[in-house]
Amino acid sequence: MNAPTSVTVRVPAKVNLRLAVGPVRGDGYHGLVNVFHAVSLYDEVTVSPRSDLAPGQAVLSVDGERPDHVARVPLDDSNLAARAAALLARHVPHATGVHIHVHKAIPVAGGMAGGSADAAAALVACDALWEGGTPRERLLELAAELGSDVAFPLIGCTAVGTGRGEQLSPLPVQGTFHWVFALVDGGLSTTKVFAEYDRLRPDAPEPTLDDALVAALAAGDARRLGAALTNDLQPAALALRPELGDLLEAGRAAGALGALVSGSGPTCAFLAESADHARELAAALRASGTCADTVTAHGPVPGATVV
């Protein structure tokens, strides 16, 4: 059987339903309890072999619907997808050089783990291209080496991440939840947001999982879930981008069941009652003038999948 000439993997964005941030640990990372929720906003990563490159070496290209976001994607070795290919190549016998093409729909530097999702997709795509047959458990270990948020897009759905966020345990979810994501101009540096968090909260307690949130997910109760959404990084994101406070308030005024900054921001997430309510909420947010654009999505959805 001939090896494939290219492989495309579709990978979802995430929203953090709970991001509890503890003190800095001895390894320099913050302890986290992070409830990840995969939503139907997807990047597509396509890999194809390049015989003129060393095994694991990658060249990158990117396109997408939003040129301002595409322009912010690094095309050098700092790109997590390129690092994923290089890492996997050290662990499979028939690695080649690769061209990695990313079609972006997940906001860049928006707090929805777009770069991490692309890295997860690159692991799956390169393993299929190189016929590595790497077990999913091993891919999860490699993903954790790349970054705290890279493992979750491999499994998708809804999961709690502990440690620095990479130790995953799936959570039961009943039904489907509907979301609006409000996009704003510019990004926010995760490093700067965590630094501001440390300044604002130097004596952070150990992070915990919220039983009310877990129960709301298991019951499929959107109203209870909306009331349980929390993000410890939100005050830091608002300190760096105060205008996000107006955006969150606009969503609440328009009837969102819950509103929060997604991850380190600046994208903001709003929970709706239904798909119709999500469309109405998105229109109200655009009309408010507090965001550049909106997208609607639902979750949970599966993780990185070959298409």
Curated annotation (Swiss-Prot):
Answer yes or no on keyword Ligase: no
Pfam families linked to this entry: GHMP_kinases_C, GHMP_kinases_N
MF term (GO), any: ATP binding
**Annotated positions binding ATP:** 107-117
Task: Kindly state which keywords UniProt assigns to this record, in alphabetical order.
Answer: ATP-binding, Isoprene biosynthesis, Kinase, Nucleotide-binding, Transferase
InterPro entries from the xrefs?
A: GHMP_kinase_C_dom, GHMP_kinase_C_sf, GHMP_kinase_N_dom, IspE, Ribosomal_Su5_D2-typ_SF, Ribsml_uS5_D2-typ_fold_subgr
| HAMAP family on file | IspE
Protein name per the record: 4-diphosphocytidyl-2-C-methyl-D-erythritol kinase
Q: Which species is the source of this protein?
A: Thermobifida fusca (strain YX)
